[in-house]
């Protein structure tokens, strides 16, 4: 929260117009990124990755312009996270403003960590010659064993950082319709958003969920068609058989990870919309239908880890929603009949998702579940080969993004499997970042999870927040045995959910 202070430069009408242009451009660009990211084959190719990078940098520039107008020229646009007239910043030690500043500092520290690792590189790997070219480096600073891959990692995550902070700043801004009551009443309005959520957040969640539902439908049709062409267009270099891929993702587990991140968000969003609208309008049930399709997709994809995570979130999410429905006071405008129907719809959602998954995926998934122990044994052998890397470079690691090239030095023979990803993001992060970089990541995630308990911000409905936490927890659990955080579209969605959480508070 910015403190009121005399502006350094006078505010002009053109500045206000420029601010609104930047806000509108941020919204449109963000919507493009939400749709583009998964459909562009999961953003796994250089052309799609750099499209997202440039879009992220553009969001960063737009954010810098907005912060400049607010900070240097004293512009105070109506925002849901701004204190009302006569109200000071929230009291207490744990405030949203302090956590936001701490997370901003951690973001800069992480980017600096990666940048120093690339600039202070100890080696560059030449793929044409399969050899390392070693350089002098400062040993007590982070350093990379493949400068090229670490630079790629830096540019990608600079774009993600810009996107994250642009979304954090854009979401609590008020739309024109939300600003009008402020103008009419001279600012004396409630700071609680209509329909329980601000309009921009509702718009973002609608787009995420409907886009995810369409993505899921395409993936199901593609699996039934069985040609092995991603989006019916391209045959990937790896996983060319239809059962190994799903939708635009060449690896079925990545598709499952994306859907398991998104469908709990849709379910929580539907619950909030149902509570606010009841049965006066029925359009919000499209959110439930899209979430149902997405919840079935991890099972249909035949990803073993994805199916287990789906089942876990379904059980925990349903138990939580039903329990809180009966334990806490109902919505004042909700009748007992409407409450019962809502619970019936929730239970029906779970049963329908499992039935849909069973109908289209169980026949292929069952043999893979019976071989789960064998699959884990194979991965544990790779983990055992990789663990000495973490032991040899415990503090700074081998450098962000360098696992692929450094792992070859630890293979027992040329016959040893040489993976591009370790299929264990927890261990790979420990190897490439060391405990120093890993601590920064853990602190940043901790700040996001603590944000809801801090004072100040947008009212965050308890049920929606818990389902967002479950979505993040499911992705983190799956990361123990796979590589969701090596896929840009999944990481982008993970950060979008974190940006939403960074605006929520149980005590605005």
Q: Residue locations for each model-derived region?
A:
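Soluble non-cytosolic domains of exported or imported proteins
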Residues: 158-161, 377-380, 401
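Interfacial helix-loop-helix linkers and transmembrane-helix boundary segments
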Residues: 94-99, 197-200
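TM-adjacent membrane-interface loops and short helices in multi-pass inner/ER membrane proteins
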Residues: 251, 380-419, 426-429, 433-440
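Extracytoplasmic loop-helix module adjacent to an early transmembrane segment
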Residues: 128-136, 374-393
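Peri-membrane helix termini and adjoining interfacial loops of integral membrane proteins
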Residues: 74-84, 125-138, 227-241, 326, ...
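Alpha-helical transmembrane segments of multi-pass inner-membrane proteins
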Residues: 2-20, 24-43, 50-64, 104-124, ...
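Transmembrane alpha-helix boundary signature
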Residues: 65-97, 113-131, 137-142, 148, ...
